[in-house]
Amino acid sequence: MKIDTILTVAALLAVCSPSRPAWARESWPEPTEAAKQRVAEFRQHEQDVLKHIQPELEAWAKKGKPFIPWAAKPGDLPQAKVPAFPGAEGGGEFSFGGRGGRIYVVTNLADSGPGTFREACEAAGPRIVVFNVAGIIQLQKPVFIDAPYLTIAGQTAPGDGVCVAGESTLVNAHDVVIRYMRFRRATTNVFDRDDALGGNPVGNIIVDHCSASWGLDENLSMYRHMYSPPGGGKDLKLPTVNITIQWSISSESLNPYNHAFGSTIGGLNSTFHHNLWACNTARNPSVGMYGDFTLVNNVLFNWHHRTVDGGDENSYFNIINNYFKPGPDTPTNDPIRYRILKPEARRAKPPVDDFGKAYVTGNVVEGNEKVTADNWAGGVQIEPLGDPVPLLRGIRTDQPFAHALLTAQSAVEAYQSVLAGAGATLPKRDAVDTRIIDEVRTGKVTYEAGRGIITDISQVGGYPEYQGAPAKDIGADGIPLAWKKKYKLDVNDPDLAGRDLQGDGCTVIEKYLAGLDPTKNIDWSNPRNNVNTLTADTFKPAR
């Protein structure tokens, strides 16, 4: 079917209008002097963190674990020989994380001090963070992850698990693995409009089974980092490289200032699969960088004026087998209702209608049989200065662009898998995610007055309680004594957690975190072994 016969008049009129309606314009008030002072304090705190960790960064560089802040291509960062964890896929699959490093056990919910989340994240050197406390970690200022080689294992928390609240967690390094964590910011101070989880990530990043909500810019954003060259000069905006966000949820970005945005993501060798974007007006998600962008098996629900958009003339989109479900806030008589992708073009200099390329197939738009049957029958929309018909022909490609290894499902299968398994499902799914999943499944939102778009968390019940008693048999290495005894390990070995007993590339604590038998050798060269062994609600891949 020819593109010029399937693009509707309504779509042409919509995409050719450059002005934004009032509801799409942000309305940030001017910050007060007190607010500006608060921002200055946050910036000073990060400078203090950088100064504190610098000697250790230099020491670890001599040990073969350097910080590489100038990375701008996938090959600039070394890759591990085995997956970051069983079930890791995509561009970030071979992140080192904190493998072989010091183990931090989070034992209290304070903002700072010994045994806190901040202490572990703002340290330097390879490190693995486990939890022996449940509850809300109420941050007073952002947490800055400024040193590479970090693994955060939220699945280790007792009871209902933990939730990071009040401020942002900012990833400004490489080789960072974050699993089964909740980041629910909820701050509405205009001076501090930031993401729940974001930052300036360099690369080798994988975010898995995390839940991000109630951000004031976006909920979960990772796509670029700023690099300051030695000797001064202008800071360089570089792409994040080797990144995966998988099995995660970005929901209910706050909208007091017309800015309830889900995510800006991207980078080089970037993969985003089995995620859910729900009840965000826009950026569901937005593509924040040039180059390859692979979006597979995601679910989008209840957007208002933007679904997937962004990129530039050097973008190569794989938009494959995603499920788009309009909600109460999605306009009924507007092309946005069935929009799958809106690629952006060069605007600053000629040629002004220079778009990238897109492989768009297998996506389902619930309620629109035409676009579901043929995603190019109005699902790809542009805002050109010239004739859109030949431009759409030039954007379209019938073969996918090269991307990292990934196990894919149909859009309908992915819809069920995402609702069953996305977000911080361990140690258990919390009331927020349970409610969001129910809203997606039924199409009925909790906050009816805002059609699912909220300005304050009180409109949806606020924070739930997270309860759980600390385990009594967890030592400094973060591994329960009972688990060591179960596998007849040497309980008196102070270095046991960091040992690779089977020579398969995984340490004892990594096998504990992944629910694996530490006495068995795993052949990681067989992709069939790279399966999440922690949760049964994710599908079993057939590789």
Could you tell me what each predicted segment is?
Residues S95, G115-E122, Q138-A147, G166-L170, ...:
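Short, T/G/N/S-enriched strand-turn elements that build extracellular solenoid repeat scaffolds
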Residues S27-A59, P66-K73, M289, T294-I457:
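Extracellular beta-rich repeat passengers
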Residues I137-T271:
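Right-handed parallel beta-helix
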Residues V460-R543:
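Extracellular calcium-associated, cysteine-rich motifs in secreted modular proteins
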Residues F85-V129, L496:
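Acidic Gly/Asp/Thr-rich repetitive segments characteristic of extracellular carbohydrate-active
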Residues T151, T156, R182, S211, ...:
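A structural signal for beta-strand register positions
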Residues S168, A196, N219, A260-T264, ...:
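Structural detector of coil-to-beta-strand junctions
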